[in-house]
């Protein structure tokens, strides 16, 4: 099966191309921290030769608790993103939660993300599609891998075929997520070769059954990322923080920022090896 290529400026995202890193921080905590984290990512990815797109949310609209930090909001968030682009020349991905956000966000960033909890909302899909932007679709935790083809078709019917699909784990009973490694191939087939990326960070979440915030298993980041890349995918989606225990959202799943370079060096070596192999067609 021919693998589709989605272009983000000069970055080619495809399952048979060198992996692209979609990474940054969970939510914009401050302008200064965003600058610090983005600068580190750019430095490391430039050194290792890894295509890079900075990720952060300007509004975490789906927090469990009404008391949890959501972010700086649309206006301030776009100002920070524009400064990051102007300063570092970086591509940016962020999520939108309402139809009204789609165009203003697409005017600034390079990729707009459809959140997992909203992936079947047709009005939101239509609004995002009409921007013409590259779209990253988070596969819902409650959706089987084969069903992602319906979402891709919905975007295509709305006039946008620049679709990336993102695996972020599946519900396993209450409060736990697992990643089905067979699902990556199913998603490729169901979407007719769309690029698949792997959100390692959020796949490591493990909720406290009675708490308001997610726990996590960041100590297993490396093994999970290696397993995903071994299936031959287009990219990784990672969140890091200089002090994960002080992060304002999903710290327990975040990669410590000082581990980024050794982590990515291993991931690049593995990806290069996997993609050096010829395909074996088994019917």
Curated annotation (Swiss-Prot):
One of its GO terms (molecular function) is 3-deoxy-8-phosphooctulonate synthase activity. Keywords: Cytoplasm, Lipopolysaccharide biosynthesis, Transferase. It catalyses: D-arabinose 5-phosphate + phosphoenolpyruvate + H2O = 3-deoxy-alpha-D-manno-2-octulosonate-8-phosphate + phosphate. Pathway: Carbohydrate biosynthesis; 3-deoxy-D-manno-octulosonate biosynthesis; 3-deoxy-D-manno-octulosonate from D-ribulose 5-phosphate: step 2/3; Bacterial outer membrane biogenesis; lipopolysaccharide biosynthesis. SUPFAM superfamilies: Aldolase. GO terms for cellular component: cytoplasm. GO terms for biological process: keto-3-deoxy-D-manno-octulosonic acid biosynthetic process. The keyword Zinc-finger does not apply. InterPro entries: Aldolase_TIM (IPR013785), DAHP1/KDSA (IPR006218), KDO8P_synthase (IPR006269). It is found in: Cytoplasm. Its EC number is 2.5.1.55. HAMAP family: KDO8P_synth. Belongs to the KdsA family. NCBIfam families: KDO8P_synth, PRK05198.1, PRK12457.1. This is 2-dehydro-3-deoxyphosphooctonate aldolase. It comes from Vibrio campbellii (strain ATCC BAA-1116). The lineage of its organism: Bacteria, Pseudomonadati, Pseudomonadota, Gammaproteobacteria, Vibrionales.
């Amino acid at each position: 099966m021919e693998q589709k290529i989605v272009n983000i400026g000069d970055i080619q995202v495809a399952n048979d191309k060198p992996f692209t890193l979609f990474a940054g921080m969970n939510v914009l905590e401050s302008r200064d921290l965003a600058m610090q984290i983005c600068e580190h990512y750019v430095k490391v990815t430039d050194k290792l030769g890894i295509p890079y797109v900075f990720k952060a949310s300007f509004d975490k609209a789906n927090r469990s608790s009404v008391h949890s930090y959501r972010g700086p909001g649309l206006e301030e968030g776009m100002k920070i993103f524009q400064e990051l682009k102007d300063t570092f020349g970086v591509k940016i991905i962020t999520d939108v939660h309402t139809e009204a956000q789609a165009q203003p966000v697409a005017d600034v960033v390079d990729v707009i993300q459809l959140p997992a909890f909203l992936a079947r909302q047709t009005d939101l899909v239509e609004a995002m599609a009409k921007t013409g932007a590259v779209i990253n679709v988070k596969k819902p935790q409650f959706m089987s891998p084969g069903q992602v083809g319906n979402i891709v078709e919905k975007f295509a019917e709305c006039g946008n075929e620049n679709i990336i699909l993102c695996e972020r784990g599946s519900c396993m009973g209450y409060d736990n997520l697992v990643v089905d490694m067979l699902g990556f191939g199913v998603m490729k087939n169901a979407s007719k070769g769309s690029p698949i990326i792997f959100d390692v960070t959020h796949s490591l979440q493990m909720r406290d059954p009675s708490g308001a915030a997610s726990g996590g298993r960041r100590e297993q980041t490396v093994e999970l990322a290696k397993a995903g890349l071994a299936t031959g995918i287009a990219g990784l989606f990672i969140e890091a923080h200089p002090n994960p225990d002080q992060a304002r959202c999903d710290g327990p799943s975040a990669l410590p920022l000082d581990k980024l370079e050794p982590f990515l060096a291993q991931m690049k070596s593995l990806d290069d090896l996997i993609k050096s192999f010829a395909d074996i067609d088994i019917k």
